[in-house]
Amino acid sequence: MLDKRTDLAGPGISTYEAVEKILPHNYESLLDVKRTQQAIYDVKEYIEKGLAKELNLMLVQVPLIVEASSGMNDMLDRDGSRTPVEFPCGLGLDIPIRASIVQAATKWKRWALQQFQCDVHEGINTDMRAVRKDYFLDHDHSAYVDQWDWEQVINEEDLTLSYLTDIVKKIWKVFVGAEKMVMDKYPELQDPRFPPLPEELHFIHAEEILAKYPDLPRKERETRIIEEYGAVFIYGIGWVLDDGYPHEMRAADYDDWVTPTIEKDGKLMHGL
């Protein structure tokens, strides 16, 4: 078992010995290579359209490279240990541009909301590509990242747990719908070993999970809670919990993990 401090640094398994144990050595795809690619793009198209509809988003392009001095890149966590790939570029320039490959589009998206003149409760979505050279590589984490990044303009009064919960439910609705679509279109994917996504999410604060499993590091706490409920959304993963550790190290310059959001039995819990 990892100790709690070792277990803080982002997603994934954290040791290559554990990766070796968890990776199946007899894996066979349920679809052939061609149909796998077709299914991937069907799912991506469904989710893109679903997010656009549910969250009022427009699809935009995001840069792969930004100027290192722009402040647009993402350090991924609060201790600055995951640095971006940087290189000089600009043939013929007396002073080359110091370029930086994006690790995430988090800061750029907030600038882009203004650039695209989005109104309140309008937003953007982008199919972001990035390189995270300092990522631990495991069964579902790569140094190459291809992910959706979305952002929405909200009012200050929207900074509530109820608004966050409503947004998460809309996203989950899209995911469940995407699974149903791809299962119907590719019936080979209907395998009893892989049960369908639950229709409903269970919402819980990181402090409450710690109270249930006080002696376990957070990844094992996550495993226990997901075994109990099937699908879980965790509030408050960045604020320091009762045991002196945050649920996970989060970036200090854009994630809101300090806003008080829940009070139970006279106790304040932090972090959206």
How does the language model describe each region?
Residues 2-7, 11-141, 149-153:
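Class II aminoacyl-tRNA synthetase-like tRNA-binding/catalytic domains
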Residues 32, 36, 53, 71, ...:
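Alpha-helix capping and helix-coil boundary motifs
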Residues 42, 145, 229:
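Short, well-structured alpha-helical interface segments that form or flank functional binding sites
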Residues 50, 54-58, 174-178, 182, ...:
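Short secondary-structure junctions and interdomain/linker hinges
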Residues 92-110, 162-167, 211-237:
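Hydrophobic transmembrane alpha-helix bundles
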Residues 111-126, 180-185, 237-261:
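A short, terminal or domain-edge coil/loop segment
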Residues 121, 126-215:
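Extended, charged alpha-beta segments that form solvent-exposed binding/catalytic grooves
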Residues 203-272:
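A translation/RNA-centric and nucleic-acid-associated enzymatic feature enriched
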